[in-house]
């Protein structure tokens, strides 16, 4: 499904110009910028997800499709990470939507969404908080080789990996399903 387009406000537009000038090699193409930059827009996107995508989230949460980057993913991580959305609010709204649907929204959608937010995202956040800064430099396998350009350009020859790299380069976003 096609996502709503968020027209950048004046401050966002000026920040985009600064990013382009100061960080020309950063991930993401600013022509694809479609992210909320305030609480109200982030809340609206949460509501839009629950209205338009939530019902199919459970069936497609781990799916990848090179022709449809976002599919039924919530795209809420940047807002949770930056504090524009609160995990508890997201979970409560998802529960409310599920119960009001009287069975229209499948249990795998609500369970999958809540598990991703609470059971995975918040758990890993706790792991980071508990173990940083030493966790940042752990290298269990003691690998020392540098990655070649294929790993930055999406030309490794491994199609799902290449697709994920290219999407990161285009959108500065990769669905969690690529990381499983």
Q: Language-model features: where?
A:
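Conserved small/polar residues in nucleotide/adenosyl-binding loops
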Residues: 179-180
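Glycine/tryptophan-enriched, flexible segments
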Residues: 1-115, 124-125
């Amino acid at each position: 499904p096609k996502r709503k387009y968020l027209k950048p406000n004046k401050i966002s537009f000026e920040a985009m110009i600064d990013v382009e000038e100061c960080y020309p090699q950063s991930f993401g193409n600013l022509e694809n910028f479609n992210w909320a930059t305030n609480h109200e827009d982030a809340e609206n996107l949460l509501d839009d997800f629950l209205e338009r995508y939530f019902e199919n989230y459970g069936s497609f949460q781990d799916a990848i499709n090179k022709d449809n980057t976002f599919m039924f993913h919530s795209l809420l991580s940047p807002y949770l990470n930056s504090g524009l959305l609160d995990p508890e609010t997201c979970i409560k709204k998802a529960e409310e939507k599920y119960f009001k649907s009287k069975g229209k929204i499948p249990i795998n959608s609500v369970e999958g969404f809540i598990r991703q937010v609470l059971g995975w995202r918040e758990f890993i956040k706790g792991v980071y908080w508990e173990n940083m800064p030493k966790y940042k430099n752990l290298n269990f396998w003691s690998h020392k080789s540098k990655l070649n350009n294929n790993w930055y350009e999406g030309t490794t020859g491994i199609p799902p990996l290449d697709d994920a790299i290219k999407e990161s380069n285009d959108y500065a976003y990769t669905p969690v399903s690529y990381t499983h």
